[in-house]
């Protein structure tokens, strides 16, 4: 039986004879059902079509971005961190083929997979099986897992130390279990924060933003944004990578704090009067 994949969000579902009637991810107000209706594919069909490829790009020393071209579903970018012989795949993407597996194995493989939130669960189990790697998801997002697996480990609390210098932090916001990855050795020791879109980079790369639903433009409350900013304030990070190939290259920690203040002012009618 096939593992069907939603064409809109790219998340793979449990094995069924026929396509599911609906997609749990897309029916939620943080995603959307395509105007043309719910459609499905499989990883096998995607490979057979032969029109997709994954592009690995070196972003900085020991950090690679991975993106599918042409864009599929949400179109997110995953990241591979090389950390003292322990490689972490941060967030995931739907398309996986042998070429990608070979390229990543040349870089040392994958020893762990960590997810920011359910929109990027994609074919995480396929990746875990290909590299025999555990998947780390915060327990607050357990209900959104559409393909269960023994590879999945649900972590609890506010932080998870994967290895010295690699830590997951639960920030919530976009999803209750929404997490970011702090890589203290990144950016030549100045620190990197990989955020998915728990914190996203704005069009002006000196600013970031926060949302409950990006496609449906539902903001987060001021109290939650204030809480997110407070949680990352003690962390040292000069650079921030989001899930869509946008980067705050310098002073990212200051950008987050400054952006949170602006966001809260906007919600409280203190930023502008139009």
From Swiss-Prot:
CDD domains: YmaE-like_MBL-fold. PANTHER family: METALLO-BETA-LACTAMASE FAMILY PROTEIN (AFU_ORTHOLOGUE AFUA_5G12770) (PTHR36839:SF1). This is Uncharacterized protein YmaE. It comes from Bacillus subtilis (strain 168).
